[in-house]
């Protein structure tokens, strides 16, 4: 029996930030040694909302390069661009044809984003969860790393696989699609905004000061941390519900400095913010320096980056096409020799 397979990805819209790294990519790096790992840049999802076509290609390559710079190893995982594997779009259509409309209309993220877009909301945004289901189910993923905001989408993928495909077109002995399970991420999965300790750090936040991106220069990192929201109390502590910003910033320091929560809490127990913030800024700059240096090397060598992504695409296609063929057969499509 082979290693369990895991599939994950992130959109290329907006710059990747500390939350993406500490909450997701860092976990993917660890999974490479124990799991059959597929990681993709989900550029098809990026166009479900208004986007800038002049930036999409560069943003996609930048995101792929950051995966590699953060420690994803093409010798131990498959890194690819979603739109370069045609099976994603075809399986999405097949799943669309068996998925009830009301399943999609109840998705919380769709409701929230539809309010923002008003009459301009696209069918693609409504269908986003079905495309995500296709992404997952194509690779026979055993596990899918998910945060709180994606749990409902994974449940939909499981329901489509089990109730709409396997139950109708397969059998208990020979299911058409593997039903994935969620992989709960370890500590550090929720990095909060620098401007609101109760909100998750997000690429979509209009306030750029709310996040530290992986490519922010040292002076900008220092500036953002200096301006980060705090409280008037002296001394830093964890797990005080009345001090969410303190919990978030101290947690970042514990991770970025490598000291861990206990040592960080002891070190900062009597500190004021004027003493602590430079320490956090230095830790963030030092942690991101090797990532930024490696990213610069990769973006300067497009031939190598293209080679890695082409290899990942080929590996992904071999798995995805086999899964797609099973679904096509189960649904009764004709074959021509």
From Swiss-Prot:
<keyword id="KW-0547">Nucleotide-binding</keyword>
<dbReference type="GO" id="GO:0006436">
    <property type="term" value="P:tryptophanyl-tRNA aminoacylation"/>
</dbReference>
<feature type="binding site">
    <location>
        <position position="135"/>
    </location>
    <ligand>
        <name>L-tryptophan</name>
    </ligand>
</feature>
<dbReference type="InterPro" id="IPR002306">
    <property type="entry name" value="Trp-tRNA-ligase"/>
</dbReference>
<keyword id="KW-0436">Ligase</keyword>
<feature type="binding site">
    <location>
        <begin position="200"/>
        <end position="204"/>
    </location>
    <ligand>
        <name>ATP</name>
    </ligand>
</feature>
<feature type="binding site">
    <location>
        <position position="191"/>
    </location>
    <ligand>
        <name>ATP</name>
    </ligand>
</feature>
<comment type="subunit">
    <text>Homodimer.</text>
</comment>
<keyword id="KW-0648">Protein biosynthesis</keyword>
<feature type="short sequence motif" description="'HIGH' region">
    <location>
        <begin position="12"/>
        <end position="20"/>
    </location>
</feature>
<dbReference type="Pfam" id="PF00579">
    <property type="entry name" value="tRNA-synt_1b"/>
</dbReference>
<feature type="binding site">
    <location>
        <begin position="11"/>
        <end position="13"/>
    </location>
    <ligand>
        <name>ATP</name>
    </ligand>
</feature>
<keyword id="KW-0963">Cytoplasm</keyword>
<protein>
    <recommendedName>
        <fullName>Tryptophan--tRNA ligase</fullName>
        <ecNumber>6.1.1.2</ecNumber>
    </recommendedName>
</protein>
<dbReference type="InterPro" id="IPR002305">
    <property type="entry name" value="aa-tRNA-synth_Ic"/>
</dbReference>
<dbReference type="GO" id="GO:0004830">
    <property type="term" value="F:tryptophan-tRNA ligase activity"/>
</dbReference>
<dbReference type="GO" id="GO:0005524">
    <property type="term" value="F:ATP binding"/>
</dbReference>
<keyword id="KW-0030">Aminoacyl-tRNA synthetase</keyword>
<dbReference type="InterPro" id="IPR014729">
    <property type="entry name" value="Rossmann-like_a/b/a_fold"/>
</dbReference>
<comment type="similarity">
    <text>Belongs to the class-I aminoacyl-tRNA synthetase family.</text>
</comment>
<keyword id="KW-0067">ATP-binding</keyword>
<dbReference type="InterPro" id="IPR024109">
    <property type="entry name" value="Trp-tRNA-ligase_bac-type"/>
</dbReference>
<dbReference type="GO" id="GO:0005737">
    <property type="term" value="C:cytoplasm"/>
</dbReference>
<dbReference type="InterPro" id="IPR050203">
    <property type="entry name" value="Trp-tRNA_synthetase"/>
</dbReference>
<feature type="binding site">
    <location>
        <begin position="19"/>
        <end position="20"/>
    </location>
    <ligand>
        <name>ATP</name>
    </ligand>
</feature>
<feature type="binding site">
    <location>
        <begin position="147"/>
        <end position="149"/>
    </location>
    <ligand>
        <name>ATP</name>
    </ligand>
</feature>
<feature type="short sequence motif" description="'KMSKS' region">
    <location>
        <begin position="200"/>
        <end position="204"/>
    </location>
</feature>
<comment type="function">
    <text>Catalyzes the attachment of tryptophan to tRNA(Trp).</text>
</comment>
């Amino acid at each position: 029996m082979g290693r369990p397979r895991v599939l994950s990805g992130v959109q290329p819209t907006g710059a990747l930030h500390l939350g993406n790294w500490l909450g997701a990519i860092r976990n993917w790096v660890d999974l490479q040694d124990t799991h059959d790992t597929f990681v993709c840049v989900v550029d098809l999802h990026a166009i479900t909302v208004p986007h800038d076509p002049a930036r999409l290609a560069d943003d996609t390559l930048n995101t792929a390069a950051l995966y590699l710079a953060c420690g994803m190893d093409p010798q131990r995982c498959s890194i690819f661009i979603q739109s370069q594997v045609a099976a994603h779009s075809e399986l999405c259509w097949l799943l669309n044809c068996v998925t009830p409309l009301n399943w999609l209309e109840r998705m919380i993220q769709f409701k929230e984003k539809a309010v923002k877009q008003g009459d301009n909301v696209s069918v693609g945004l409504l269908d986003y969860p079905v495309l995500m289901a296709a992404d997952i189910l194509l690779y026979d993923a055993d596990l899918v790393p998910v945060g709180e905001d994606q749990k409902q989408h994974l449940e939909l993928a499981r329901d489509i696989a089990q109730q709409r495909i396997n139950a109708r077109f397969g059998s208990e002995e020979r299911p058409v699609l593997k039903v994935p399970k969620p992989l709960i991420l370890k500590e550090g999965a929720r990095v909060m905004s620098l401007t609101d300790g109760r909100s998750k750090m997000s690429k979509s936040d209009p306030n750029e000061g709310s996040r530290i991106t992986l490519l922010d220069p040292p002076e900008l990192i220092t500036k953002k941390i200096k301006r980060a929201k705090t409280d008037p109390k002296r001394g830093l502590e964890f797990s005080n519900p009345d001090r969410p910003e303190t919990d978030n910033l101290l947690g970042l320091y514990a991770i970025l400095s490598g000291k861990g929560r206990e040592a960080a809490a002891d070190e900062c127990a009597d500190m004021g913010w004027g003493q602590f913030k430079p320490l956090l800024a230095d830790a963030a700059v030092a942690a991101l320096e090797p990532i930024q240096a490696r990213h610069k090397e990769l973006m300067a060598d497009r031939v190598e980056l293209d080679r890695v992504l082409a290899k990942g695409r080929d590996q992904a296609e071999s798995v995805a096409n086999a899964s797609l063929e099973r679904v096509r057969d189960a649904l009764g499509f004709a074959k021509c020799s």
